[in-house]
């Protein structure tokens, strides 16, 4: 169940109400194809909105379970996070100098804005979200995304570069490996297993992760 993306945060998280107050709303671009939709400007009203309440999620999970269907939640990280960062912009790299809005389309270089891997508050934030997600979904698995993480800001972010130096990481790809491993370990500490997209194979794969292939006919996942 794809619950979050650049274009909207779609699950109620009690600890972080701005995720749905801000992150679940976006500007309207009537008549425009998805790739052609201009990004939100600061102060522009957001009229397209919607999200699942926690009661909605419980109802969906129960309906599916009655039909022997397992609902696996996906919480994207470190990319596809514009909606979350529109709500909590301090979780982006401090070098981001543009307005972060919920993207109505592909977003262009605004899609470069992802969670800061050098900021410990990011991990606390995501762990708290995982806590609420685990309480709602009985599935054995939690999907953590991991795809299409552009490293534009990580390369110039002092916090990310300090993290790389501290952890002995060779490059920003390894920094994503650190990010995903840290979050995977947290998910596993909750008794769940991790799923992710095939970009996780670009560096050390989190132990036991189930890889979903979407590039190159799934060859990375196959390996």
What are these regions (language model features)?
Residues 81-91, 152-153, 195-223:
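Substrate-binding cleft/loops of secretory-pathway carbohydrate-active enzymes
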Residues 1-192:
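Substrate-binding cleft of carbohydrate-active enzyme catalytic domains
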């Amino acid at each position: 169940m794809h619950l979050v993306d650049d274009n909207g945060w779609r699950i109620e998280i009690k600890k972080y109400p701005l995720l749905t107050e801000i992150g679940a709303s976006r500007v309207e671009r009537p008549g425009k194809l998805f790739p052609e939709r201009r990004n939100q400007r600061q102060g522009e009203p957001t009229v397209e909105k919607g999200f699942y309440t926690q009661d909605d999620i419980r109802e969906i999970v129960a309906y599916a379970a009655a039909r022997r269907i397992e609902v696996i939640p996906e919480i994207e990280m470190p990319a596809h996070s514009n909606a979350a960062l529109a709500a909590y912009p301090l979780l982006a790299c401090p070098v981001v100098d543009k307005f972060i809005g919920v993207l109505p389309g592909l977003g262009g270089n605004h899609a470069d804005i992802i969670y800061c891997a050098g900021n410990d508050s990011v991990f606390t934030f995501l762990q708290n979200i995982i806590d609420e997600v685990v309480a709602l979904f009985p599935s054995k698995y939690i999907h953590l995304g991991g795809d299409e993480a552009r490293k534009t800001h990580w390369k110039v972010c002092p916090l990310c570069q300090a993290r790389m130096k501290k952890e002995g990481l060779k490059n920003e790809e390894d920094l994503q490996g650190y990010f995903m491993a840290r979050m995977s370990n947290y998910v596993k500490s909750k008794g769940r297993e991790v799923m992710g997209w095939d970009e996780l194979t670009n560096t050390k794969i989190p132990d036991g992760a189930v890889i979903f292939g979407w590039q190159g006919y799934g060859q990375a996942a196959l390996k």
